[in-house]
Design a protein with these regions (language model features):
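Conserved phosphate-binding/catalytic loop of the ribokinase/pfkB sugar-kinase fold
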Residues: 43, 66-70, 80-117, 122
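Conserved phosphate-binding/catalytic region of the ribokinase-like
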Residues: 152-153, 157, 184-291
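Short, conserved phosphate/pyrophosphate- and ester-handling motifs at nucleotide-, phospho-/glycolipid
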Residues: 31, 169, 236
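Gly/Ala-rich phosphate-binding loop of Rossmann-like dinucleotide-binding domains
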Residues: 32-33, 137, 248
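Conserved beta-alpha-beta core of the PfkB/ribokinase-like small-molecule kinase fold
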Residues: 117-189, 208-211
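Beta-strand->loop->alpha-helix junctions that form or flank phosphate-binding loops
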Residues: 15, 41-46, 65-75, 146-148, ...
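Glycine-rich phosphate/adenosyl-contacting loop at the front of the ribokinase-like
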Residues: 1-59, 228-230
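Short gly/ser/thr-rich secondary-structure transition/capping motifs
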Residues: 61, 98-103, 145-151
């Protein structure tokens, strides 16, 4: 569509698509396409969308043994609107994802203990994320938290404190901290406010302005890669999936962010969510061409 509709306005779109989505699934697919050894845990309803989701997850090479089909629940959906400039809005209905409980986490503790990094996002109940984060901490692992959707930010303090790494975008950083990252200085201020809550590393994703890495020891701004933006839907998920893969390979923190940035940059050149995520070879080529 030329521009996102205003309240009360009806507009025409050039097309639509239906496919696998959800932040958890998108990040798992992104990591798998980049060569990561991924264990994806999720839930769908016993409906047509659930069957489609499982089929697509399998097509991306992910094991679906840990994807539950929930009786009496709809598969979660995200309604995404994309304007010609590539920006988007997303409305999420959790569906079967809301059926997870903290007690369900115990069955996955052996896998949690083996993981070098665990990706969490807020499209499942808060108490479930909290139980996973506690299990990761007990096992000496690392949590990378994507704090979207933020919702009531006051309820996130305990989860943020258990997350070694948090990677909000501009909007999420503002929602959580009250500081709008309009430039690098304000993005750093928001990141430092997040550091006060427990994480060791904050990575603020700044869209067309790149990303900002902030820890107790350093502040590093990473310039964006030069690409033609088509659709930004998969940018953050591809970034997180890329970071997780590089981190699990033992790359330096700076190289992790560069790898993640390249992954996100390639994703915005394509339409779609998980399907837009690049391969490791594509990321390597972009890193070679744009140092």
């Amino acid at each position: 569509m030329a521009a996102l509709p205003r309240p009360g306005q009806t507009i025409n779109a050039s097309g639509y698509g239906i496919g696998l989505g959800g932040k958890g699934a998108n990040q798992a697919v992104a990591a798998a396409k980049l060569g990561g050894d991924v264990r994806f845990v999720g839930a769908v309803g016993k409906d047509a969308f659930g069957e489609l989701a499982i089929k697509e997850i399998q097509q991306f090479g992910l094991n679906t043994n840990s994807v539950r089909m929930v009786d009496g629940a709809d598969t979660g959906i995200a309604i995404i609107q994309v304007e010609e400039a590539g920006q988007n809005t997303i409305v999420v209905c959790a569906g079967a994802n809301a059926n997870w409980t903290a007690s369900d986490v115990k069955a996955y503790e052996p896998d949690i203990a083996k993981a070098k990094i665990t990706l969490l996002q807020r499209e499942v109940p808060h108490e479930v994320n909290l139980a996973v984060a506690k299990a990761v901490k007990a096992a000496g692992g690392t949590v990378l938290l994507d704090p979207a959707p933020v919702g009531d930010a006051s309820h996130m303090a305990d989860l943020i404190s258990l997350s070694e790494i948090i990677s909000p975008n501009e909007t999420e950083a503002a929602e959580i901290t009250g500081i709008e990252p309009t430039d690098i200085a304000s993005a750093e201020a928001a990141a430092r406010k997040l550091l006060e809550r427990g994480p060791k590393i904050v990575i603020v994703k700044l869209g067309g302005r790149g990303s900002l890495l902030v820890s107790a020891d350093e502040v590093k701004h990473f310039e964006p890669f030069k690409v033609k933006v088509v659709d930004t839907v998969a940018a953050g998920d591809s970034f997180n999936g890329g970071f997780a893969v590089a981190y699990s390979q033992g790359q330096s923190l700076h190289d992790c962010v560069r790898f993640a940035s390249a992954s996100g940059a390639i994703a915005v050149t394509r339409v779609g969510a998980g399907s837009a995520a690049p391969t490791a070879e594509e990321v390597a080529e972009l890193l070679r061409n744009q140092h």
